[in-house]
């Protein structure tokens, strides 16, 4: 049986080998790190009173770290107790030690906050590569968090950028954010209210003459009124019957009503604010290219350009109506212009996404959908297969019924979609026994298909939600860096006096101390007990 070697300890800073000979710190480091027999020796690591025991060869897997390099960890060696002492977070060291045992797997314990565990990674010097991989696994922001966000170099531009881009930066920035949210809400309310029949009739200036149907002052046809559901979709349009006396006399009235309409005036004020906000943010942004790559800025552009297109089209239309007499070709061109304009102005509804700039919940939802694109793609693919399968099955099951509501397989696509999604619209339904069996299987398959990827999406949402919560807490509290011996040292139980113990402690004082965060002075401090 191999005799177990041991280390005989002498005075502080002095180590004796297996035969009792005296060794200095350098010889002890070489004996500890090199050689096949010594690499299997075990050592004790004391983390704030909790003792861990491991082998030297386990720590030597990562020689560039604090524990893997004998020259670095010897500064924490306590010759009085024959152990390495670290006044650090105890739950975190389980994961740190597992990093060595597993060959590079770094997993944060669930009961350790993110910022505290990252401090432990830096203290034990696991390296920037391990820290970057850990941050990527945790889905963290780039190193430095809020301090690393690009800011303009000019002081005035920086202040303007913070005012309009970061509502949490100051009180005036929060005030601007509140104004922006109110303007967005007013714009959305106006977009909805202007489609009400009573407002459209009042805005047009009256009703029809003798038929009981609301028409514009120019006596437009009922078909044109249906097409013009917007408040300012060509209020000066020429009626289908040509430009008569009544139409000519009311042309100027129509043009005036467009620009004096209350909905148009409120919409104009909202657009003025949106345009001002966009131009100010663009002029103060640190990178013009990155500005247009931001999806929120693209939404801002999409939210305002329909107004200018509508306004320009209205001015051109008024000019053409005043210079060209009516006709069928002119009316057809107007009808096409109306259809195009309605599609363009429908984009105004995307203005509601501007709220996501000021809503953490919408941002979390967007990140969840972005992270769940693979699962959503699988869901759509499964639904596509089910729609093809069950629409074909119900068509052939109902083919012998003369009253069948499924004239073809493509017509049955709609039924398959609403059945698999458990909506059950009711406009199409099977009437034969075989068709009802197919419908039952379709509903069951739809429930299973939709239920499979939902837990993954919910898990992604919980992940982003808890990450956002931790980042908010990190902005309020910061863990106090510990590990340095206190200057007020007291006498110990082994008989050493206060001066002797202080001298021995200075010899073991670590040269590596974590650099305090730049923003620590500006935050409330939370000391770990």
Swiss-Prot record:
* Stretches assigned to the Cytoplasmic side: 1-171, 285-295, 359-373, 466-529
Write the protein's name.
Potassium voltage-gated channel subfamily A member 6
What are the disulphide bonds in this sequence? Answer: none
What Gene3D superfamilies does the record point to?
A: 1.10.287.70, Potassium Channel Kv1.1, Chain A, Voltage-gated potassium channels. Chain C
Q: Where is the composition biased (Polar residues)?
A: 210-219
In the UniProt record, which is one GO cellular component term? axon
Q: Where in the cell is it found?
A: Cell membrane
Q: Where is the composition biased (Basic and acidic residues)?
A: 500-510
Its recorded reaction(s) are: K(+)(in) = K(+)(out)
The UniProt annotation puts motif Selectivity filter at: 422-427
The UniProt record lists lipidation (S-palmitoyl cysteine) at 285
Q: Indicate the family of this protein.
A: Belongs to the potassium channel family. A (Shaker) (TC 1.A.1.2) subfamily. Kv1.6/KCNA6 sub-subfamily.
What's written under domain?
The N-terminus may be important in determining the rate of inactivation of the channel while the tail may play a role in modulation of channel activity and/or targeting of the channel to specific subcellular compartments.
> Which biological process terms from the Gene Ontology are attached to this UniProt entry?
potassium ion transmembrane transport; protein homooligomerization
Membrane topology of this protein:
Multi-pass membrane protein
Q: How does it assemble?
A: Homotetramer and heterotetramer of potassium channel proteins. Interacts with KCNAB1 and KCNAB2.
Q: Which residues cross the membrane?
A: 172-193, 263-284, 296-316, 338-358, 374-395, 437-465
S4-S5 linker, as annotated region: 360-373
Q: Which organism is it from?
A: Mus musculus
Q: In this chain, where does the modification Phosphoserine occur?
A: 3, 511
Annotated motif PDZ-binding, positions: 527-529
Q: Where is the composition biased (Acidic residues)?
A: 21-30
């Amino acid at each position: 049986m191999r005799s177990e070697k041991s280390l005989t300890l002498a005075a502080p800073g002095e180590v004796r080998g297996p035969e009792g000979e005296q060794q200095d710190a350098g010889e002890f480091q070489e004996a500890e790190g090199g050689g096949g027999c010594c690499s299997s020796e075990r050592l004790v690591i004391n983390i704030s009173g909790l003792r861990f025991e491991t082998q030297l060869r386990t720590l030597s897997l990562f020689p560039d770290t604090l524990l893997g390099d004998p020259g670095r960890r010897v500064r924490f060696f306590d010759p009085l107790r024959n152990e390495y002492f670290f006044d650090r977070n105890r739950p975190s060291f389980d994961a740190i030690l597992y990093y060595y045992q597993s060959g590079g797997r770094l997993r944060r314990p669930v009961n350790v906050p993110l910022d505290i565990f990252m401090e432990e990674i830096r203290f034990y010097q696991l390296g920037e590569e391990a820290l970057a991989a850990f941050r990527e696994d945790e889905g963290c922001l780039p190193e430095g968090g809020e301090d690393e966000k690009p800011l303009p170099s000019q002081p005035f531009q920086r202040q303007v950028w913070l005012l309009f881009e970061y509502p949490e930066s100051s009180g005036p920035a929060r005030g601007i954010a509140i104004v922006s949210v109110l303007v967005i809400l007013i714009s959305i309310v106006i977009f909805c209210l202007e489609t009400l029949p009573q407002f459209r009739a009042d805005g047009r200036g009256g009703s029809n003459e003798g038929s009981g149907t609301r028409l514009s002052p120019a006596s437009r046809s009922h078909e044109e009124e249906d097409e013009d559901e917007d408040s300012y979709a060509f209020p000066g349009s020429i009626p289908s019957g040509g430009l008569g006396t009544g139409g000519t006399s009311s042309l100027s009235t129509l043009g005036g009503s467009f620009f004096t309409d209350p909905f148009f005036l409120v919409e104009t004020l909202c657009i003025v604010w949106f345009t001002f906000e966009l131009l100010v943010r663009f002029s103060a942004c640190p990178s013009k290219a990155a500005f247009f790559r931001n999806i929120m800025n693209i939404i801002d552009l999409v939210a305002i350009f329909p107004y200018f297109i509508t306004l320009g089209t209205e001015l051109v239309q008024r000019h053409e109506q005043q210079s060209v007499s009516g006709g069928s070709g002119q009316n057809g061109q107007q009808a096409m212009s109306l259809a195009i304009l309605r599609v363009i102005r429908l984009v105004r509804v995307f203005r509601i996404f501007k709220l996501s700039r000021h809503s953490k919940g919408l941002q979390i939802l967007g990140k969840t959908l972005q992270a769940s694109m693979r699962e959503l793609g699988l869901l759509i693919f499964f639904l596509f297969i089910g729609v093809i399968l069950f629409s074909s099955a119900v068509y052939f099951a109902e083919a012998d019924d003369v009253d069948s509501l499924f004239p073809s397989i493509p017509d049955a696509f709609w039924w398959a979609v609403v059945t698999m999604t458990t909506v059950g619209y009711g406009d199409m339904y099977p009437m034969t026994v075989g068709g009802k069996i197919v419908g039952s299987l379709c509903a069951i398959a739809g429930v299973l298909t939709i239920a499979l990827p939902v837990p993954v999406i919910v898990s992604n949402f919980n992940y982003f939600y808890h990450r956002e919560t931790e980042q908010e807490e990190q902005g309020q509290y910061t863990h106090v860096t510990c590990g340095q011996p206190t200057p007020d040292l007291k006498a110990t139980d082994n008989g050493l006096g206060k001066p002797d113990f202080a001298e021995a402690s200075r010899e073991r004082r670590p040269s590596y101390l974590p650099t305090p965060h730049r923003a620590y002075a500006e935050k409330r401090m939370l000391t770990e007990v």
